[in-house]
Amino acid sequence: MANLLQTLETEKLVLNNRLVFPPMATEKSNEGGKLGQGILDYYNEKSMGGYISLIIIEHSFVNEKGRASKGQLSVADDRNNEGLKELASIIHKNGSKAVMQINHAGSATTSEITGNEIVGPSQVMHLRGKEIPRELTK
């Protein structure tokens, strides 16, 4: 606890304290994972005042076939570039740094969510799953 409010420096990053906001699945993205005003408002509120040194932006899918939920944010293509720039700008303006958590849900998703056949490391149903995924070979 003694170091919580002390600066943390790495070779390429300086944090004004050691407070980190973890990624939260807000489910606030628009159709297709598009970044909307709800996400901008949410992170504006969380980063306001710069008290949190580092904000980890919620898990965002890297491929449509790996989408975890309907409201998940997308980084699967360039459609969100302008919105992501605006999001980073808001967080930085408020005095925090930003990093994004990216993911592929694999067998933890469903074809209902992705609109595609689900894939995974093996043909074993995920504990929370409803479908047996197609095993990836390469």
Q: What spans do the regions from the language model cover?
A:
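Non-globular sequence segments
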Residues: S89-H92, K97, N103-K138
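N-terminal capping/small domains of soluble enzymes
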Residues: M1-N103, M125-L127
